């Protein structure tokens, strides 16, 4: 965008923070409530797209050290690995494993492999959506 739209840029900074925060919430609440990796990925993607609309695409891509094509591939590999590794241990495809772990700062945390699978979905969705939008807009993807 070549115009200096101060209001749009100022509001975008606030809204992007809100979108990313809400995306984290939806992602982490998703295995027990509606949400998860797909919806969280859509919310994250909308934050990136809003930044591309408010600021210059090349300027945003220079400031973000993210290659969205690699992000898409990494997310797909995480999801496939999380889904298929249990088969090597005689368990069915997409078998869920749970553990209760105590971290020094966080305390007692309930951890599942579903969260890792959903992380792969989130990264894949963000990578695909942003790459498609950059390809459509003619920006570097």
Swiss-Prot record:
The keyword rRNA-binding does not apply. Its main location: membrane. One of its GO terms (molecular function) is antiporter activity. Coiled coil: none annotated. Keywords: Antiport, Cell membrane, Ion transport, Membrane, Transmembrane, Transmembrane helix, Transport. It is a multi-pass membrane protein. InterPro entries: CPA3_antiporter_subunitB, MnhB. It comes from the Bacteria. It holds the Pfam family MnhB. One of its GO terms (biological process) is monoatomic ion transport. The chain crosses the membrane at residues 10-30, 35-55, 70-90, 116-136. GO terms for cellular component: plasma membrane. It is found in: Cell membrane. Belongs to the CPA3 antiporters (TC 2.A.63) subunit B family. May form a heterooligomeric complex that consists of seven subunits: mnhA2, mnhB2, mnhC2, mnhD2, mnhE2, mnhF2 and mnhG2. This is Putative antiporter subunit mnhB2. It comes from Staphylococcus epidermidis (strain ATCC 35984 / DSM 28319 / BCRC 17069 / CCUG 31568 / BM 3577 / RP62A).
């Amino acid at each position: 965008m070549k115009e200096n739209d101060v209001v749009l840029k100022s509001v975008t900074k606030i809204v992007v923070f809100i979108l990313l925060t809400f995306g984290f919430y939806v992602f982490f609440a998703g295995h027990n409530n509606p949400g998860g990796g797909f919806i969280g990925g859509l919310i994250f993607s909308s934050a990136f797209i809003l930044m591309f609309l408010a600021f210059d695409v090349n300027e945003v891509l220079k400031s973000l050290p993210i290659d969205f094509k690699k992000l898409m591939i990494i997310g797909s590999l995480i999801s496939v690995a999380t889904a298929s590794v249990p088969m090597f241990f005689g368990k069915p495809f997409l078998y869920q494993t749970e553990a209760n772990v105590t971290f020094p700062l966080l305390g007692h945390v309930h951890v599942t492999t579903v969260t890792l699978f959903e992380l792969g979905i989130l990264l894949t969705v963000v990578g695909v959506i942003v790459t498609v939008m950059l390809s459509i807009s003619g920006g570097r993807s």
